[in-house]
Amino acid sequence: MAPNLRKSHPLLKMINNSLIDLPTPSNISAWWNFGSLLGICLMTQILTGLLLAMHYTADTTLAFSSVAHTCRNVQYGWLIRNLHANGASFFFICIYLHIGRGFYYGSYLYKETWNTGIILLLTLMATAFVGYVLPWGQMSFWGATVITNLFSAIPYIGQTLVEWAWGGFSVDNPTLTRFFALHFLLPFAIAGLTLIHLTFLHESGSNNPLGIVSNCDKIPFHPYFTLKDILGFTLMFLPLTSLALFSPNLLGDPENFTPANPLVTPPHIKPEWYFLFAYAILRSIPNKLGGVLALAASVLVLFLSPFLHKAKQRTMTFRPLSQLLFWILVTNLFILTWVGSQPVEHPFIIIGQLASITYFTILLILFPIIGTLENKMLNF
């Protein structure tokens, strides 16, 4: 009998073990769809980005008009650009839901998978930031100026670091050129990190909603989960294409329709919606260095999740107190996002400060306490 090529060929064997014959827990819910959705988001972004790069000019005098040219004169250029811009939003929606699922179901106990995931998040944030600068509109320019300027808060080397990043004494042509180079490069770094992320995941196997070992009840990935993933793709592409076709500028800033002008500061500088929660935490501290540290901590705190898990049960499925705390945290993140979009004035300042304190208190103090308390309740 001839050997099955799918199982014997060196390359196909790897694909087979990762996507076809992979033993998968039979009870994983739709919350486990976001990994594959992130994969399809990445592929879509790389494809649309490549097509946009063919028509883009990384020069301060031409960048804005080259984007306008793409939208007006290139065949379906408007659609490619709208899909790329809104695809970034969907990428972040998926990654936040993916992290939320990992947090709720205790997936962070697979430490290597979790840590590579956080590195992926940081790389994605860097990619989105440098990408937002490329159209060279007002918010692009001032966003780049404000965020890169934060590095000057680093003692001793800060100012040198900022000027090195800018390639001069202000955000100018060298900055735009290097940001374009980075924006082109980083998605491929994300693709490479994704393979590492998957390698670590397949080392342990997927977690499941019950958080128990599922070796006794596994089914092949194909056809069951390939079909489920295709349904997920459809359900994601539907709102993405609807947004790109009917309301492409809904999530953007009107300020970015004005070409960058270093002499005119926009009344309210703010990043894209997916960074607003971190921006609100940054603004809630009146000290520059303190704000930068809080901003970094808002994401890096995720690295501590495996060490702050005190509960005997892995998931929150049967832990109502932790569930309540989790949803308070989610609500708190929505409040931070809203505050980040508001001007720096009363009452938004105090709301932002309270929400920032609540964010860190829940993650660092309340979750371990509630976990320990629930352990005690198990003994009654």
Swiss-Prot record:
Which residue spans adopt a coiled-coil conformation according to this UniProt entry? none
Major localization listed first in the record, in broad terms:
mitochondrion
Instruction: Give TM regions.
Output: 34-54, 78-99, 114-134, 179-199, 227-247, 289-309, 321-341, 348-368
Task: Please give the GO cellular component terms listed in this UniProt entry.
Answer: mitochondrial inner membrane; respiratory chain complex III
Q: Subcellular location, in the record's words?
A: Mitochondrion inner membrane
Q: Does the keyword Transmembrane helix apply?
A: yes
InterPro entries with a match to the protein in the record: Cyt_b/b6_C (IPR005798), Cyt_b/b6_C_sf (IPR036150), Cyt_b/b6_N (IPR005797), Cytb/b6-like_sf (IPR027387), Cytochrome_b (IPR030689), Cytochrome_b_C_euk/bac (IPR048260), Cytochrome_b_N_euk/bac (IPR048259), Di-haem_cyt_TM (IPR016174)
Q: Which residues are noted in the entry as heme b b566-binding?
A: H98, H197
Question: Cofactors per UniProt?
Answer: heme b
Pfam families assigned:
Cytochrom_B_C (PF00032), Cytochrome_B (PF00033)
Membership in a protein family:
Belongs to the cytochrome b family.
Any remaining note in the record?
Heme 1 (or BL or b562) is low-potential and absorbs at about 562 nm, and heme 2 (or BH or b566) is high-potential and absorbs at about 566 nm.
- Subunit comment for this entry? The cytochrome bc1 complex contains 11 subunits: 3 respiratory subunits (MT-CYB, CYC1 and UQCRFS1), 2 core proteins (UQCRC1 and UQCRC2) and 6 low-molecular weight proteins (UQCRH/QCR6, UQCRB/QCR7, UQCRQ/QCR8, UQCR10/QCR9, UQCR11/QCR10 and a cleavage product of UQCRFS1). This cytochrome bc1 complex then forms a dimer.
What is this protein for, i.e. what is its function?
Answer: Component of the ubiquinol-cytochrome c reductase complex (complex III or cytochrome b-c1 complex) that is part of the mitochondrial respiratory chain. The b-c1 complex mediates electron transfer from ubiquinol to cytochrome c. Contributes to the generation of a proton gradient across the mitochondrial membrane that is then used for ATP synthesis.
* Name this protein carries in UniProt: Cytochrome b
Name the species this protein comes from: Fulmarus glacialoides
